[in-house]
Design a protein with these regions (language model features):
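Nucleotide-activated chemistry modules centered on ATP-dependent adenylation/adenylyltransferase
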Residues: 2-400
Length: 400
């Protein structure tokens, strides 16, 4: 009788390394799959493949879904200026969903009996993986050895060593999740709510030779098409270029306190130069190209979109409806946003757009008006005051 097949969502870390070896030893045919949303280098992927086979995997595959991640989610996060708590660009949470979808597809393609991942029982990722697998691969068993057996790091390392696999799984002071849309940093001083991270905890440091630099990001219908005049057809390449520029000034560092899906509070530090610069540039351009109510309702919808992504609700049927609204809102978001970069900070400067509503011939704010007379203005003010005059006419003694 043939062995059962299991696809392991393989990152190369301790938990998934243990999972591959343990399931192999237990008689499973293990298919290791690394879903890459832009966070792995070519060298890291090569090492992952080598280690997967050393651990006993029957097969290994890299599932590159970086561009799919952009087309199906990341661009909508830009359209919606999504920052959780007006701070965190929900990098890890949004990427996990697409990693899980890729793993589920792979499991169905090879006819797997089970899917395994290395999440613990403490965080959000267990929900994102399990929920996606339950929906995308119904009937396929979900295996989570680290969570279900409450394994310690020492137990996993000892098991690997006993079976001839040795790697540097030394518990570092900080843990990092690196992605195309930012790097999250956990551990160390972050566990103390009164402390921030020291300089050495960050992966990116100030390396720019100039004290300040100008960054110009050009958008067409809300999508990046050029950086400092250099055109980009590949949106991922454009994001990487902005990250390279912004990271040289160590821009995008911050710390977010938020609510986990389960309901407890959590604190995470991050560095995200590209997301911070892109979102603020995009927001700046929208201020000049969208109407007041377009901005208002898009802010509400963008917040909902980000919350649903974080809460593992990407597959909720309302999400394509939200994406359609966000896409429609971008039809006039064209032009170049100008930013000024300095070490550890940046500021918005201005925009150059053919759809700039501040260029209206009807008038200039605080200057001359051409679309109405003084009497028109007085009439508008009087009519606009009607609800207040009615209320305070009925309640003349009510004070504010």
């Amino acid at each position: 009788m043939a062995n059962k097949k299991v696809v392991v969502a393989f990152s190369g870390g301790l938990d998934t390394s243990y999972t591959v070896m343990k399931l192999t030893q237990d008689g499973w045919d293990v298919y290791a799959a690394c879903a890459n949303t832009g966070g792995f280098s070519a060298e890291q992927l090569k090492t992952n493949e080598e280690n997967a086979y050393k651990l006993g995997a029957k097969a290994y595959v890299t599932l590159d879904v970086t561009h799919e991640y952009y087309e199906k989610s990341l661009k909508y996060m830009i359209f919606g200026n999504v920052l959780r708590n007006n701070c965190y660009p929900i990098s890890v949470s949004s990427e996990r969903i697409f990693q899980a979808i890729a793993i589920a597809r792979d499991a169905k393609e090879i006819g797997a009996d089970a899917i395994a991942h290395g999440s613990t029982g403490a965080g959000n990722d267990q929900i994102r993986f399990d929920m996606t697998f339950l929906v995308m691969a119904p009937g396929v068993e979900i295996i989570t050895l680290t969570r279900d057996k409450a394994l310690s790091r020492k137990e996993e390392v000892d098991y690997l060593n006993e079976h001839g696999f040795f790697a540097d799984f030394t518990k570092l002071k900080y843990s990092y999740n690196v992605g195309i849309w930012g790097t999250s940093i956990c551990g160390g001083e972050i566990l103390d709510p009164t402390q921030g991270l020291p300089e050495e905890a960050y992966l990116k440091h100030v390396t720019a030779k100039e004290e300040e630099a100008e960054l110009k990001i050009t958008f067409e219908k809300g999508e990046i098409v050029a950086v400092n005049g250099e055109k980009f057809d590949d949106k991922i390449a454009a994001i990487q270029k902005i990250e390279e520029i912004g990271a040289s000034y160590a821009i995008g560092r911050d710390c977010n306190v938020g609510d986990t899906i389960i309901g407890i509070k959590g604190r995470v530090a991050f560095e995200a130069a590209a997301p911070k610069l892109i979102i603020e540039a995009h927001r700046l351009l929208e201020k000049s190209t969208l109407s007041k109510w377009q901005q208002y309702w898009k802010d509400q919808v963008g917040n909902w979109y980000g919350m649903f992504l974080h809460e593992s609700q990407y597959l909720e049927p309302v999400m394509p409806d939200i994406e359609a609204m966000l896409t429609s809102s971008q039809r006039n978001v064209n032009g170049t946003a100008i930013l000024k970069l300095r070490p550890l900070s940046f500021q918005t400067v201005g925009v150059d757009s053919p759809d700039d509503l501040t260029k209206s011939k009807l008038g200039e704010y605080g200057e001359m008006q051409h679309g109405w007379t003084a009497e028109d203005a007085k009439g508008f003010i009087k009519v606009s005051s009607t609800p207040l005059r009615v209320y305070y006419g009925m309640h003349p003694n009510e004070e504010r």
